[in-house]
Amino acid sequence: MEKRNSLSREEVLSASESIIREIDALIKKNKSIVLLGFMPLGNEIDLRALYKKILAGYYKENFDIDIILGLPRVCGKEMRFFKIDSLDNLEKSKFGIMEPRLNSEEIIAKNAHVMVPLIGLDKDKRRLGFGGGFYDKYFGKHKDNKLYGLVYDFQMNIDFEVNEYDIAMDHIFMAKVG
């Protein structure tokens, strides 16, 4: 966390652009796609530039790709995903994260491509999150999805105590920093 917190805004944006290029290539391999993302907290990988392209119709107009974009919201003790039509339809949660308003349409994740924030990954691609267990619980129930861990190079191969609920990523998008 300390290393991530010390990154400059320029380093975060450069790393984010690198990962967005990889997600862009993933999107272009599909005719339709459900993409579930997250809003960045602190120096997490920032996908807002990608979300703006999606919401502006870039992929539909230029590649005839239908995209449903969803973001998570914590509701009580669980996380749910909601369709996003505008980044203006978000509000700050008690955790300080921008989330969809409750008037948004819920998405039940199935065959979605899910971009997952994390603190680190172990050698088996299991995710160390922030301790709330929201992603682990959600994707423990909704297993028919592709999970993509978005990491800086220094977040790889971290040693941490793994429990039975820690989910493994299917794929990693990694950005080298420095």
Question: Language model features by range: what are they?
Answer:
Residues 1-109:
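N-terminal active-site beta-alpha-beta segment that forms phosphate/nucleotide-binding
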Residues 77-178:
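Conserved phosphate- and dinucleotide-binding cores of soluble alpha/beta proteins
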